[in-house]
């Protein structure tokens, strides 16, 4: 049984599906009862932000799959991600019997955040920081649930792409990483799951427009994760909760990425 921590990034529509969340946290609860491997969740919550922007009559703009975040909007986005989404997930975990702690990228200096691109506004890039506090939390039997909101060196709120945040968190903890989303992994031109991809193979599929839009960010984050962590990482789906225990144990149920 591996004792290397496993970082699980939750994405897609899972945050809006109570039934799936219940099954996910039930699977985590059952796994933690019999395994000693520390688990940690990283999440975004784009749909919550989209809904909030509509209610506030603010336009949502994306550049290459990344949300443009004007400084005037970051308080609302941080509230949706570090507030509503994080506490909703924590509540679902507690309901399923999982002892959960809600955190952000800033807590304990887990990640260091710098501005990604001035054209994107308050959007940050996360680098691995100090994982000591989060490691202590996991060692005490808690499941950290980490939002993709961080603080830069000036204490300014920054919105970080959740896939990229998960990479930095995994690097800070020397952990393995799974990106869980509403897709099974990367599909070929005929809709069949590709079980493994190298960087060159992935870039070829991007050039061929087999991999498009937001999936480009996800795939490149996966490749960067494999490089940064020095180990393959996996993109898989949360749609089949009965497979999650196998995933937690390191079995491949999606697309596994390697740097070479």
From Swiss-Prot:
Predominant subcellular localization, coarse grouping: cytoplasm
Q: In which pathway does it act?
A: Amino-acid biosynthesis; L-arginine biosynthesis; N(2)-acetyl-L-ornithine from L-glutamate: step 2/4
Q: What biological-process terms (Gene Ontology) are attached?
A: arginine biosynthetic process via ornithine; L-arginine biosynthetic process
Name the Gene3D superfamilies on file.
Answer: Acetylglutamate kinase-like
Q: Where in the cell is it found?
A: Cytoplasm
What UniProt keywords are attached to this protein's entry? Amino-acid biosynthesis, Arginine biosynthesis, ATP-binding, Cytoplasm, Kinase, Nucleotide-binding, Transferase
Protein name per Swiss-Prot or TrEMBL: Acetylglutamate kinase
Native organism: Photobacterium profundum (strain SS9)
State the encoding gene.
argB
């Amino acid at each position: 049984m591996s004792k290397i921590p496993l970082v699980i990034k939750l994405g897609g529509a899972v945050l809006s599906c109570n039934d799936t969340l219940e099954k996910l946290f039930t699977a985590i609860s059952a796994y933690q009862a019999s395994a000693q491997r520390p688990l940690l969740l990283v999440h975004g919550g784009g749909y919550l932000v989209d809904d909030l922007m509509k209610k506030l009559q603010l336009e949502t703009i994306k550049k290459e799959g990344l949300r443009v975040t004007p400084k005037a909007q970051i308080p609302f986005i941080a509230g949706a991600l570090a507030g509503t989404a994080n506490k909703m997930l924590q509540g679902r975990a507690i309901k399923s019997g999982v002892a959960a702690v809600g955190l952000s990228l800033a807590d304990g200096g887990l990640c260091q955040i710098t501005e990604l691109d001035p054209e994107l506004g308050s959007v940050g890039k996360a680098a691995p920081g100090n994982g000591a506090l989060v490691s202590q939390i996991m060692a005490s039997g808690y499941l950290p649930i980490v939002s993709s909101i961080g603080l830069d060196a000036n204490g300014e709120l920054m919105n970080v792409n959740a896939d990229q945040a998960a990479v930095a968190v995994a690097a800070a903890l020397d952990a393995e990483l799974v990106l869980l989303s509403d897709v099974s992994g990367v599909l070929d031109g005929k809709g069949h799951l590709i079980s493994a991809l190298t960087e060159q193979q992935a870039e070829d599929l991007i050039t061929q427009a087999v991999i498009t839009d937001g999936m480009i960010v996800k795939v490149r984050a996966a490749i960067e994760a494999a490089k940064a962590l020095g180990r393959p990482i996996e993109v898989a789906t949360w749609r089949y909760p009965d497979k999650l225990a196998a995933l937690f144990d390191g079995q491949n149920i999606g697309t596994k990425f390697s740097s070479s």
